[in-house]
């Protein structure tokens, strides 16, 4: 079963053997089976984000579903959100990628927007994060929900309070990125 991309601002790409990339939206928007979702814990249906989760990436890779990456000016694949917590600016992206894979009219109002208010510098005063001010301001997720509702694309919207990981040093919500990492066991000295 296939479906239409809900916010078609960027087309998925896949890397090629020669180190390049190609547009791959024809493979992307499909319902696929998985053995880690049950009806005992919910509907039995889950959205996956292959760009941001190891389990999701493995399931998508096995089904041939490409990730939703941006291609920067260096030719590197990057998630839509940069390491500072905001959507990439169009002028930071590869021109050929933008021409072939980005709906500039739809994406331009989101470029440079912070995905979580906690990462917007206006909510950090003298090195201290002002959580109350950040929560009081309109967040991008609320903005996107309202855009979907106005476009008639939202079936139902309601707020759910749930646990979300926060950094123990900054109290800011954790943003996940597909990064190569290495660790040093400092307790083994």
Predicted regions and their residues:
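Non-cofactor substrate-recognition interfaces
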Residues: 1-189
């Amino acid at each position: 079963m296939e479906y239409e991309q809900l916010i078609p601002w960027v087309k998925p790409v896949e890397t090629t053997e020669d180190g390049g990339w190609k547009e791959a939206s024809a493979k992307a928007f499909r319902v696929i089976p998985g053995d880690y979702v049950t009806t005992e814990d919910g509907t039995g249906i889950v959205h996956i984000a292959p760009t941001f989760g190891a389990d999701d990436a493995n399931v998508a890779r096995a089904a041939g579903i490409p990730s939703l990456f941006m291609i920067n000016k260096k030719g590197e694949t990057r998630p839509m959100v940069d390491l500072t917590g905001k959507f990439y600016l169009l002028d930071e992206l590869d021109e050929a990628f933008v021409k072939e894979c980005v709906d500039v009219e739809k994406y331009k109002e989101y470029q440079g927007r912070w995905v979580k208010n906690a990462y917007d510098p206006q909510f950090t005063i003298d090195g201290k994060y002002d959580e109350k001010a950040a929560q009081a301001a309109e967040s991008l997720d609320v903005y996107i929900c309202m855009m979907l509702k106005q476009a008639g694309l939202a079936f139902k919207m309601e707020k759910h309070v749930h646990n979300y990981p926060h950094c123990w040093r900054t109290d800011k919500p954790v943003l996940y990125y597909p990064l190569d990492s290495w660790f040093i066991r400092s307790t083994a000295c």
